[in-house]
């Protein structure tokens, strides 16, 4: 279903009902997260499934993130398009009056993404090098830190340099460790 939805292929009647149940189940989980005061992180997947996940995450953020970020979406910054997507969802939130929750990660499907792109004769959606991925990741951090009134950051990284970058920025800007975003 996610592949079909992401490709813009219309659902058949039974698929539409099944998709509706998927959305309902996710919404129930998010409502419970809001009720008990916890965050809900939506994971990222392969690029050909991600448009459907982005659509779901955005609609849930619009619904549940009116006052504070509860719903977070995951951006795999090894993808060439994710920094632009981050800026686009920020604009949507600014215009729509909701908060954005972002979990930044570098990415997990490099070989799979590159192989699929090669087999289909498409350009790879993945940055050409680790250095470019790191640059994209750090640019994402910089963007979010400059927009903390609207965007909340969750870093999913083992990279010490990236974590220290945020800690140093917080220290320099006197942002308390318990800052809500």
Regions inferred by a protein language model and the residue ranges of each:
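Positively charged, amphipathic and often flexible ligand-engagement surfaces
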Residues: 1-181
């Amino acid at each position: 279903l996610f592949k079909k939805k992401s490709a813009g292929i219309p659902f058949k009647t039974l698929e539409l009902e099944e998709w509706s149940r998927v959305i309902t189940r996710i919404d129930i989980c998010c409502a419970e997260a809001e009720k008990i005061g916890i965050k809900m992180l939506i994971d990222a997947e392969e690029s050909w499934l991600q448009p459907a996940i982005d659509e779901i995450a955005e609609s849930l953020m619009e619904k549940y993130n009116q006052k504070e970020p509860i719903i977070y979406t995951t951006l795999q910054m090894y993808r060439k398009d994710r920094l632009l997507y981050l800026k686009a969802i920020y604009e949507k939130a600014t215009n729509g009056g909701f908060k954005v929750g972002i979990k930044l990660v570098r990415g997990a499907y490099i070989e799979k993404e590159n192989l699929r792109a090669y087999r289909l004769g498409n350009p790879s959606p993945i940055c050409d090098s680790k250095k470019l991925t790191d640059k994209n990741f750090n640019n994402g951090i910089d963007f979010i830190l400059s927009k903390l009134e609207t965007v909340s950051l969750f870093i999913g990284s083992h990279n010490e340099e990236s974590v220290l970058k945020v800690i140093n920025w917080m220290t320099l800007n006197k942002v308390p460790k318990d800052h809500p975003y």
